[in-house]
Each structure stands twice: as C-alpha cells, then as structure tokens.
Amino acid sequence: MSPFLIRPGYRRPTFPSGEGIYRLPRQFFLYLPCGETPGCAILDVQYKKVGLTMKTKSNTRFYLALVIFSLVGQVAWVVENMYFNVFIYKMFHASAQAISAMVAASAVAATVTTLLIGALSDKIGKRKVFICGGYLCWGVSILSFAFIRMDVIEALFPAAVSAASVGVSLVIIMDCVMTFFGSSANDAAFNAWLTDSTDSSNRGAVEGINAMMPLLAILVVFGGFMGFDQNEPQTWTVIFSIIGGVVFVIGILGFFLIDEPVLETRGNERYFANIFYGFRPSVIGSNPTFYVALLAYAVFNISIQIFMPYLILYYNVSLGMENYVLIFAPAIILAAAFTAFYGKVYDHKGFAAAVIPALGLLMAGYVVLYFFRSTAVVFVGTLMMLCGYLAGMAVFGAMIRDYTPAGKAGMFQGQRIVGQVLIPGIIGPAIGAAVLKNAETIVNDDGTTSFIPNENIFLAALVAAIAIWLVLIPLLRMLKKEKSHAA
C-alpha cells in the first residue's frame, strides 16, 4: 500500500504493527506502510499534493534557547576538544599520540552515550529533562578538572614514577566522564529537540546559527582567557571553575526556557532494540539518502579533525603568534556572520548549490595555510577555511535533519554522532599524529620534550577534503533522481 493522507473529519484508523501514522499541520495525518519512514522527500511530495506549506513558526523563546544552549554547549566542547589539548600539553607535556588517544576515547564515549540516551529520550518522549539535567552534571564534571594539578597528583600518588603521566591518564579518564554528561545533554537530547522543533522550511537558517556556535565558542573561551598565563596551574583552576559554573547555571535556566515538544512514542517501546535501530539493514535500505549524506559528512569531519586538535598549538608554537586570538577572533566573527546568512542558501537553493561553494572555500583555505606563514596571509587562509568549515557544517547538518525519519530523532542522533564525532574523532587525529610523527621538538624547562605542529596537517586535510567528492558526487545524483521523481 502506498503512503496517503488522512484528511480532517475522518476517524484516525488503526493499522497493523509496523505501519505508521504521522501528524501533519492542519489536522492531517500521513499514513506510511510497514518499513517506510516519512523522510523529507516523501513529506514534501505529500504536502505539495494537498497544497500545504511546510512552515514552522519559531518564536523568540525558541531562538533564545537555541543561541544560549548551543553557544554554552559549544563553549564546554571547546574546553574539551581544544583547551584540554592545550591543558595537557602545557601542564603534563603530552605527546601528539596522547592527544590523539584522548580525542579518540572521547569520540567513542560520545557515540555510545548518544546511542543510549537518544533512544531513551525517544522511548519516554522527553527531551527537556535530559537537556537540563545533563547540563547540570556537565557543569560539575568540568569543575572537577580544577583539581587535576601536579601538586594534587603528587600528594595523592607519591609512589608514581611520573606525576605527568598520571595527570595525562586522569585527564583522559575524566574527559570520558565529562563526555557522557555532555553528549547526553547536547548530542542526544538538544540536537533531537532541534530536529523536533524545525522542518525543511527553516532548518538551513537554524543550522546556520547552530553551526557558527563552535567557533564563536572558541572566540569566547580563548578571547575571554587571553590574558591568562596558561603555563600556571592556577590559571586552569580559574578557567575550569568559570566554565563549569556557567554550564551548571544554564542547566537551571533551561527548566524555564525550553518548551517540551509533544512526541509520538508509539513504536519506540523496545528500548534495547531501538538503540541499534539505525544500524538495521532494512532501515538503511529505506533511508539511503540519509546514510550517504552521513558518509559524506564523516569524510568532511575527518578532514577537519586532522588539523583542528593542533590548530591553536600551530598558531602559538609553530608560527610564534603569542596573541593569536587577535588574528583568530576577527576571522571567527566574519566566518560566523557569513554562516548565519549562508544557511539560508540551503533553504532556498538546495543542498547542491550550498555544499559545493562551502567545500571550495575550505579547500582554498587549506592551500593558503599550507604555503604561507606571514600574519596577513595566514589570516586570509584562516578566514577562508573557517567560512568553508562552518558553512559545510550548516549544510550537512540541515541535510541530515531533513532526512531524519520522523518520530526517530533521538535514535538517529547516534548515527549523526558516528559521522560527526566517532569516525572523524578516531581517524582524523590519528592521521594528524602520523603526519606529525617526525615533527620538530623543543626541550621544556624541566627537561621533557614537546612536538611542534607543522603545516603538513593542512596538506593531509586537503587530501581528505578531495576524498569527500568520491561520496558527494553519488549523493548529488541521488538527490537529482529524487527531485525528478517528485516533479
């Protein structure tokens, strides 16, 4: 039986297990046979047949919640993904391999957590409690890093051969604990809430705002603490205390700010089966566009993760830019403003028209950063790279949300994290560490050595960006075929 609309005034019928009824605006319901899911392409066709416009009115509270929770969540992720790298590099002289291991362990923790909590939030039909409760615990876990200091470690582990090695291990372990709470709140619940609260008419614009937050968070964190001496343990105590406290307070604010969406939980009762729902061959076969887009997104993020864990160290140590924030900050602001408007290109022109220029900017930025070291040219290269990075995040993010099956947003956040975090978080930093294996080293004051990141990380990232096209070309053909069938 083919999908059809049940019009207002008709009694909502009951169908055999596996078949679905999905609510549409103006009291309409969409019936789908067993095994089919209401992806964006199906919904768009059905809406056009009855003259409906897919338009979600997002109020001021929605956008306020979007900006606050997205920004503060990304501030916390910046502390983990970039500041922890600087933290263990400065305090414990961690190697590139240790940094790579930390990023990989965090990626695994994020993926497992998102699969578990995403499916759980779908089962009980609640997002708000996971967002707010998660942010509260997230803040406490960040605060705990204020106590990971050499003097504390030496007092607690007097028999340890190397307090620095213990410090690196503790940071990696606590990073995974922090990731559990952060992924529960942000990756699983908050991102599912965004999918529930938007549709294909405004996802590009919303993703434009959401995608610019990671770099705005970098600006907030590194700009806010620019005057601090990162070689002093007291500095990190202050940083972790402030960030942890802010995240905790936002968790409290969320109880008053976030509107709980009404979710359909019928069909989501089998929790443990739903954890792996998105990995079933039948589900993959029913949503091919979603999974091909996710694969392209994974390769895109591998390219980013090759250089991103070492980017600040490259500016600071390799290029000798002590005030790198003064160069990095304007590039972030301009790239964020660019992305806020660029997301609308996806809404009005579609995926193909939006993703190709974004990738072109990203690759051009890599080329400039690889060949040049002067401050002015590095700024231009950084701006191009950041514009391409943020625009790409917005476009891929909107595309994946559009093709997420309705009523399964929580379950499918795990798949999104596989493409955005797990695969890139393991492969990307490992490639970066391999590229930097024979990098120059410097001798620290205590006799230990530290590596110096070099421009080869951008060359490796460029190669990965070229590889995106191997997936992107088939994806664009699939979209063109869908469009011709819908016409």
Where do the language-model regions lie?
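Helix-loop boundary and gating motifs at the non-cytosolic
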Residues: 55-107, 289-319, 325
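Multi-pass alpha-helical transporter architecture, strongest
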Residues: 146-150, 248-258, 456-487
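Structural signature of the two symmetry-related core transmembrane helices
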Residues: 129-144, 353-368
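Hydrophobic core of transmembrane alpha-helices in multi-pass small-molecule transporters
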Residues: 71, 141, 155-185, 377-391
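Helix-to-loop junctions at the C-terminal end of transmembrane segments
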Residues: 113-126, 338-350, 436
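A membrane-interface helix-boundary motif in multi-pass transporters
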Residues: 127, 229-245, 436-466
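Juxtamembrane intracellular "pre-TM" segments in multi-pass secondary transporters
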Residues: 54-60, 262-294, 487
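Glycine-rich segments within core transmembrane alpha-helices of 12-TM secondary carriers
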Residues: 111, 204-226, 417-429
